[in-house]
């Protein structure tokens, strides 16, 4: 049986949008970043949800564009002494936990995540203390402190497999922070999952009625859905999975049109994978509803060319990720469990 923890819904203020750059400014910052990466012995590690021009720059400079699991692996294994993490803050923290000897920089430390913000350590720790018989599994989209309180860290690409494994051992689960992903995992595994009530501001906005209307316009299109989406959206999907899994599904499915229910940043790499297919954004508004994120994380959008150049050039407290040594040791244990488990799955 799945029991749901009922917490108060929160609305987070969005950061201001970066000032648009003209073509000359973009070229200036691209060249500056390339030079600074070489001078700093640095490599870019970018998430699929960053803007296309950031992903393109990571490609051009020998960096990584991936989901959070592969970002963690890449940064730990790469020979660079400095990692420039283009993403949100928990990704930078994870990189520092796995690579403490490296200098981990971010374009801005103000790049948050609604899942991270929605799972403050004091409240979450008290929640765990109230259920001492449960194994604590937290999503990668959490702070270092929340990871340190967990038994396991997990990404969406291996979430179902891990919960199946723990359920086979007879363990009852606390899942945090994303309630939609928790619901999806519970439905797939039938495990005893007690969910924290967080949500991703992007995926939470996908609308069932509007998606139904879009499907009528494109009846032959396949629907690809990230499991951070509401259950009603997941139930309409032809394929459900993490960002990397959705890109694989786009290649595997025979459909020529794909409706994609995740952050539109994924379109850059997905379109590369299927250049002959048409990608359509799943609607986040319609039927009288409006959207706030409109299928793009506002904190991911903070990773602009100017901010990346400033992060590499200035470093310091405004850009460098620091994780307390004791906290790092505690958070490293569940992270290593995740990586070891993922290795057994060969993902």
Swiss-Prot record:
Annotated InterPro entries: NadA, NadA_sf, Quinolinate_synth_A_type1
Gene Ontology biological process terms in this record: 'de novo' NAD biosynthetic process from L-aspartate
Enzyme type, top EC level: transferase
Presence of the UniProt keyword Metal-binding in the record: yes
Annotated family: Belongs to the quinolinate synthase family. Type 1 subfamily.
Task of the protein: Catalyzes the condensation of iminoaspartate with dihydroxyacetone phosphate to form quinolinate.
The name this protein goes by in its record: Quinolinate synthase
Organism: Salmonella typhi
